[in-house]
A protein has these predicted regions:
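Active-site acidic/histidine proton-transfer and metal-coordination neighborhood
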Residues: 15, 23-114, 204
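Short beta-strand and adjacent tight-turn residues that come in two discontinuous sequence segments
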Residues: 19, 47, 192
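N-terminal pre-domain/capping segments
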Residues: 1-44, 138-140, 211-218
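Catalytic-core regions built around general acid/base machinery
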Residues: 4-11, 67-75, 132, 177, ...
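Histidine-acidic metal/acid-base catalytic patches
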Residues: 41, 101-117, 121-218
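Conserved dinucleotide-binding and phosphotransfer motif residues
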Residues: 12, 78, 185
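Aromatic- and glycine-enriched glycan-recognition loops and surfaces
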Residues: 1, 63, 174-175
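Active-site beta-loop-alpha junctions enriched in small/polar residues
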Residues: 1, 21-24, 50-52, 87-89, ...
C-alpha cells in the first residue's frame, strides 16, 4: 500500500531478515527485486510456494526446480540469494519414491537456491521435520518456527481435538531437537510466527510467550 516501510522499520528499530516475493515477479525483473531487498539491507529473497500449481505432478516439479535455478542465478548476479519457503504441499508424492520436496532438494543448485524451512507445516503434514532439517543441512539458511497443539479448556464433545498453531513450548513439537539442529548448521535467523489461535485473542500475548521461550532456549 502507501505505507513507508523503510521509515517504519527504522522507527521500530528492526532489521529486515528477508524479502518475500512471487516467482513471476522475480522472473520478470530480478534486478528490481534485488534492488528492493538491498534497500532494506537484506541479502535474502524468499519464494513462498506456488499458487494454482500441481505439486503432485512430477514434470511440473522438474520445471519448477529449473525455474528456481534460473531465478536464483539472476539474483546472485545482483548480489542477492534466493530461498524457497515450504508449506505442506511439498509433501505430495510425485511418484512412488519421491515427494515434491525431494525434487526441489535434488534438482536445485545450492549456488543459486537454498531454503527457509518451516517446521510447523511439515509437522502438520505428517512428516518428520527434524529428519528433513538434517537432510537440508547448511542449505537451511532461515528457520521458520511455531509450535503445534490444541487449545481447549473443560470437556470436549468428542475425543478428537482440532490442532492449530501454538505458542512455543505449549504444543507438542520437539522444539528442543529442532532448535539444536538449526543452531548446529548456523542458520542466519530464526523467524517466529504466530498466525492465529492466539492467547486471549491477542497476537501480542502469544508472541510474548513464544519470545520468552526463545530467549530461554537459544
Amino acid at each position: 500500500g502507501n505505507l513507508d516501510w523503510h521509515a517504519l522499520v527504522k522507527e521500530a528499530g528492526l532489521q529486515v531478515v528477508s524479502l518475500h516475493t512471487d516467482l513471476g515477479s522475480l522472473e520478470r525483473d530480478a534486478k528490481a527485486v534485488a534492488d528492493e531487498a538491498k534497500s532494506f539491507g537484506t541479502k535474502y529473497v524468499v519464494i513462498t510456494g506456488m499458487y494454482r500449481f500441481d505439486y503432485g505432478d512430477e514434470a511440473s516439479m522438474h520445471d519448477l526446480a529449473a525455474r528456481l535455478n534460473k531465478a536464483g542465478a539472476a539474483l546472485k548476479a545482483e548480489g542477492v540469494e534466493l530461498l524457497y519457503h515450504n508449506h505442506n504441499c511439498e509433501l505430495r508424492h510425485v511418484n512412488a519414491e519421491k515427494r515434491a520436496y525431494d525434487i526441489l532438494l535434488e534438482e536445485t543448485d545450492p549456488q543459486f537456491v537454498n531454503f527457509e524451512f518451516d517446521s510447523y507445516w511439515f509437522t502438520e503434514g505428517g512428516a518428520n521435520a527434524l529428519a528433513w532439517m538434517q537432510r537440508l543441512g547448511t542449505r537451511m539458511k532461515l528457520w521458520h518456527i511455531n509450535d503445534r497443539g490444541t487449545r481447549i479448556s473443560g470437556s470436549a464433545v468428542t475425543p478428537i481435538l482440532k490442532t492449530d498453531s501454538m505458542e512455543l513450548g505449549t504444543g507438542n513439537m520437539d522444539l528442543d531437537s529442532l532448535m539444536a539442529q538449526a543452531l548446529s548448521v548456523g542458520v542466519d535467523a530464526v523467524i517466529l510466527e504466530s498466525h492465529r489461535n492466539w492467547v486471549d485473542n491477542s497476537p501480542i500475548k502469544s508472541l510474548q510467550i513464544s519470545a520468552e521461550y526463545l530467549e530461554k532456549h537459544m
